[in-house]
Regions:
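A cytosolic-side transmembrane-helix exit/cap motif
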Residues: 118-119, 143-144, 196-199, 223
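Generic recognition of well-ordered alpha-helical segments
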Residues: 18-22, 131, 184, 218, ...
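Membrane-embedded helix bundles of polyisoprenyl
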Residues: 70-89, 93-188, 207, 213
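Membrane-interface coil-to-helix junctions
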Residues: 1-78, 106-122, 241-249
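Periplasmic/ER-lumenal interhelical loops and adjacent helix-loop junctions
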Residues: 210-249
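Membrane-interface helix-loop-helix junctions at transmembrane boundaries of multi-pass membrane enzymes
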Residues: 149, 190-201
Length: 249
């Protein structure tokens, strides 16, 4: 049944809450009206799929349909991202296709799908690795100076930093910054000068700069004494009851 969610449990139910609370009329399933409606102070650290759910919600308000579309898109988005990165580093099309498909269907994605679907959506991880490669191989990449904005890769890095900062609920941005720190350490040890790690520091700063606005709603909620979904957990068990009720109703 297309209207019945493919998976249950884990953070995937968060997206059910997004559809039912933020982007359409609330459903009449068993969970309503006994759970708390999401407030104005939700952190926006996973905007990639917030935007996806909002867009799909323009055409259908059926929870199961949106949920299933979310599940089906993840492997293809991961594979497409992998293909793009492999092409950018100079691999042939057929090799890029093969490696991208392998990345999109990796067991990790399948295992995380039913538990933490936001982590299965790891389409910006290849771009994290690409940024590390650019820092290591391109001496002009993300180097502070007058010609900073004349380098096309620097503009691409800004776009990638936004995607990384808004993907994986802050997990993947932190991992990316860690990878960049390791890259910076290797470059400093290789060249024996601190300036060798400058591009990594600039890239980390770009990711952090994009992440800061994502947490503004949460901070405002805490300052107002109302908390947020991150601090009071309003989504977890209530929406879990609601999504399970779809199987019954």
């Amino acid at each position: 049944d297309w209207h019945v969610p493919m998976f249950y449990g884990g953070d995937g139910i968060y997206w059910v809450g997004q559809v039912q609370r933020s982007y359409g009329e609330l459903s009449g399933s068993l969970g309503w009206p006994f759970y708390e409606v999401a407030g104005r102070y939700d952190p926006n650290y996973d905007l990639i799929y917030d935007i996806f759910v909002w867009f799909v919600g323009l055409f259908t308000k059926d929870t199961g349909t949106v949920f299933n579309l979310y599940v089906l898109v993840i492997p293809f988005a991961n594979a497409l991202a992998g293909y793009a990165v492999f092409r950018m580093v100079g691999l042939r099309r057929w090799l890029s296709f093969a490696f991208g498909l392998t990345f999109g269907l990796t067991p990790y994605v399948q295992q995380r799908m039913a538990g933490h679907m936001m982590l299965a959506a790891c389409e910006f991880v290849p771009f994290s690795v690409l940024l590390c490669l650019w820092c290591a191989e391109d001496e002009q990449f993300n180097r502070p100076g007058r010609g900073f904005f004349k380098n096309k890769r620097n503009w691409l890095a800004l776009a990638m930093a936004w995607g990384i900062a808004n993907n994986g609920a802050a997990y993947y941005p932190y991992f990316t910054c860690f990878f960049l720190c390791v890259t910076a350490l290797c470059l400093i040890l290789r060249d024996r000068r601190w300036r060798a790690g400058a591009s990594c520091v600039v890239t980390i700063a770009e990711i952090v700069a994009w992440m800061i606005p994502d947490f503004f709603p949460m901070v405002l909620g805490i300052l107002n004494g109302q908390g947020s979904t991150l601090t009071n957990g309003v989504y977890r068990s209530p929406v879990g009851a609601d999504i399970y009720s779809l199987r019954i109703s």
